[in-house]
């Protein structure tokens, strides 16, 4: 028999899971999401991607600023949920909320726990050069991503993969995993295992100060840095354009042959020297402009061989 669920999520990453649980036939009593925020040129209040999808599905949406009041707890309990599914909600759940559903609260986390607990597991996995990532369903407790694990799926991280690529792949994989987990919970057969005490690491929130590219690092490290911050906040450097240093974000690149001083342009195809080897820029973005391929950029803004790219 389908479960009665409360779904809690906010960004695009959570939308596939909401859709998959709804398509499975679970009774989603309510969707909790973060409050609307100003966005766009007019800075009008906009609901989160999850809230918009829930409204389209006809599911009641709640956007409380806190869950730590008696009123918020009473409202949450009023849904009489069998379980809560939490995917990138963006708010820490107090113990009283965790205890409210009959069968508990279950979180979809975008890493292979206990590695990369915390806010930015996808970015940190790519930036650290991890060979793989994945998604895990865990039964939540009051710790930071410390709950017992129910199910997991893995995915390889390639040199060509940006955070956007990994995000989209894990969102799809995670939706299927959560459907399987809730089906097992429905049957009474969901098995839990404690997380290992070894290999614990924390994925700190990305700081914009990290975005500056240091071409004095090895090419592989520069590539991982760029792909781990693409598209947001976007790893940047300054290109000499019309006599000025113009900041551009490099969104996608590849390892390339060549040697030179770090930051030196090795050709007319946006190949830039690093401490060892080089990277070739594949996609970039100027401030206020749309992302474009390197070929599109160079048609309007040729960059000569031998010039130096700065990241001051």
UniProtKB/Swiss-Prot annotation:
InterPro entries: Fmt (IPR005794), Formyl_trans_C (IPR005793), Formyl_trans_C_sf (IPR037022), Formyl_transf_N (IPR002376), Formyl_transf_N_sf (IPR036477), Formyl_transferase-like_C_sf (IPR011034), GART_AS (IPR001555), Met-tRNA-FMT_C (IPR044135). GO terms for cellular component: cytosol. Keywords: Protein biosynthesis, Transferase. (6S)-5,6,7,8-tetrahydrofolate binds at residues 111-114. Signal peptide: none annotated. SUPFAM superfamilies: FMT C-terminal domain-like, Formyltransferase. One of its GO terms (molecular function) is methionyl-tRNA formyltransferase activity. Gene3D superfamilies: Formyl transferase, C-terminal domain, Formyl transferase, N-terminal domain. It catalyses: L-methionyl-tRNA(fMet) + (6R)-10-formyltetrahydrofolate = N-formyl-L-methionyl-tRNA(fMet) + (6S)-5,6,7,8-tetrahydrofolate + H(+). It is an enzyme of class 2 (transferase). Its EC number is 2.1.2.9. CDD domains: FMT_core_Met-tRNA-FMT_N (cd08646), Met_tRNA_FMT_C (cd08704). Attaches a formyl group to the free amino group of methionyl-tRNA(fMet). The formyl group appears to play a dual role in the initiator identity of N-formylmethionyl-tRNA by promoting its recognition by IF2 and preventing the misappropriation of this tRNA by the elongation apparatus. Belongs to the Fmt family. HAMAP family: Formyl_trans. This is Methionyl-tRNA formyltransferase. It comes from Rhodopseudomonas palustris (strain HaA2). The gene is fmt.
């Amino acid at each position: 028999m389908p479960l009665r669920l409360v779904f809690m999520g906010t960004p695009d990453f959570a939308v596939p899971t909401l859709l998959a649980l709804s398509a499975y036939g679970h009774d989603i009593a309510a969707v909790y999401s973060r409050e609307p925020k100003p966005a766009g040129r007019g800075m009008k209040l906009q609901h989160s991607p999850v809230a918009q999808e829930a409204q389209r599905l006809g599911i009641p949406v709640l956007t409380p600023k806190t869950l730590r009041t008696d009123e918020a707890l009473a409202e949450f309990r009023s849904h009489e949920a069998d379980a809560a599914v939490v995917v990138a909600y963006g708010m820490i759940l107090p113990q009283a909320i965790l205890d409210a559903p009959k069968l508990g609260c279950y979180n979809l986390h975008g890493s292979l726990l206990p590695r990369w607990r915390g806010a930015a597991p996808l970015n940190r996995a790519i930036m650290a050069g991890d060979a793989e990532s994945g998604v895990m369903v865990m039964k939540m407790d009051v710790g930071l991503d410390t709950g017992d694990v129910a199910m997991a799926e893995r995915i390889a991280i390639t040199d060509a993969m940006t955070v956007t690529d990994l995000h989209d792949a894990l969102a799809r994989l995670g939706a299927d995993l959560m459907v399987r987990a809730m089906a097992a919970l429905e049957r009474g057969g969901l098995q839990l295992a404690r997380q290992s005490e070894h290999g614990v690491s924390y994925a700190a929130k990305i700081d914009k100060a990290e975005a500056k590219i240091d071409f004095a690092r090895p090419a592989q490290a520069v590539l991982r840095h760029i792909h781990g911050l693409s598209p947001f906040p976007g790893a940047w450097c300054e290109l000499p354009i019309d006599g000025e240093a113009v900041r551009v974000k490099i969104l996608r690149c590849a390892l390339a042959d060549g040697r030179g001083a770090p930051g030196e342009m090795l050709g007319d195809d946006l190949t830039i020297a690093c401490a060892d080897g080089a990277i070739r820029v594949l996609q970039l973005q100027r401030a206020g402009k749309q992302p474009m391929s390197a070929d599109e950029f160079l048609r309007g803004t040729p960059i000569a061989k031998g010039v130096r790219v700065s990241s001051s």
